[in-house]
Curated annotation (Swiss-Prot):
PANTHER family, per database record: ATP PHOSPHORIBOSYLTRANSFERASE (PTHR21403:SF8), ATP PHOSPHORIBOSYLTRANSFERASE ATP-PRTASE (PTHR21403)
Assembly: Heteromultimer composed of HisG and HisZ subunits.
Domain notes: Lacks the C-terminal regulatory region which is replaced by HisZ.
Gene Ontology terms describing biological process: L-histidine biosynthetic process
Catalytic activity: 1-(5-phospho-beta-D-ribosyl)-ATP + diphosphate = 5-phospho-alpha-D-ribose 1-diphosphate + ATP
Function noted in UniProt: Catalyzes the condensation of ATP and 5-phosphoribose 1-diphosphate to form N'-(5'-phosphoribosyl)-ATP (PR-ATP). Has a crucial role in the pathway because the rate of histidine biosynthesis seems to be controlled primarily by regulation of HisG enzymatic activity.
Keyword set includes Transmembrane helix: no
Protein's organism: Bacillus mycoides (strain KBAB4) (Bacillus weihenstephanensis)
PROSITE patterns hit by this protein: ATP_P_PHORIBOSYLTR
Keywords from the UniProt entry: Amino-acid biosynthesis, ATP-binding, Cytoplasm, Glycosyltransferase, Histidine biosynthesis, Nucleotide-binding, Transferase
Superkingdom of source: Bacteria
Location relative to the cell: Cytoplasm
Principal cellular location given in the protein's record: cytoplasm
Protein name stated in the entry: ATP phosphoribosyltransferase
Length: 211
């Protein structure tokens, strides 16, 4: 069997995705006690894992460094990559939301300033609504932007809403739901078709059995 390299995201999705691979018989013991390592071999299989930042997973898959990747739908929406999106894993579910301080008026005709880590998604959303907004890209915590007057509102991913609540913000609009997706390199799907579809089929069966 040909070797398969899978790119996973470090952080939020990691805790949801590793159990899925274990349930379909792909050992991930080294991922649980990884230290500073970023490349791991699954024992007794032809599969290895690489751990990278979420924004880089699709890039590694697009360029063929990884055959398969698991990444949030937010990354695929923000950064359009030449890959195949194969499976909605149904984990890491959260929502894109417009949030601000309680006095924010979403119906105001004044041009709004929106702070976000996701300028493409935000611009598309407001454009589709027919609203002209100024997008301010923020790399760190966006919750502070309305509090300091940098922006009228923010667009961000909301999982529990706890961070918003702690900063005195509330959700005004729910834009869309997102979750973890399995993506595949286009060339690998041809050259390693059997190996890749074996993983995909097992994952789909596991997801269906868990519903």
């Amino acid at each position: 069997m040909r070797n398969i390299q899978i790119a996973l995201t470090k952080g939020r999705l990691e805790k949801h995705v590793i159990p899925l691979f274990e349930k379909i018989g792909i050992g991930c013991s080294e991922l649980k006690d990884k230290g500073r390592k970023l490349v791991f071999k699954s024992k007794n299989t032809n599969i290895s894992f690489i751990l990278v930042k979420a924004v880089d997973v699709a890039t590694y898959v697009e360029h063929g460094v990884a055959d398969i990747g698991v990444v949030g739908k937010d990354i695929l929406m923000e950064f359009e990559k030449d890959i195949y999106e194969m499976v909605d894993l149904g984990v890491g579910v959260c929502k894109f939301c417009v949030a601000s301080i309680p006095t924010y008026n979403p119906k105001s005709y004044r041009k709004k300033r929106i702070a976000t880590k996701y300028p493409h998604i935000t611009s598309t959303y407001f454009h589709d609504k027919g609203e002209d907004v100024e997008i301010i890209k923020i790399e760190g915590s966006v919750e502070i932007a309305p509090l300091l007057g940098l922006a009228d509102a923010i667009v961000d991913i909301v999982e529990t809403g706890k961070t918003l609540q702690e900063n005195g913000l509330i959700v005004f609009e729910e834009m869309c739901s997102i979750s973890a997706r399995m993506i595949v390199n286009k060339a690998a799907l041809k050259t390693k078709k059997d190996e890749i579809f074996r993983i995909i089929n097992m994952m789909e069966q596991e997801i269906l059995s868990g519903k």
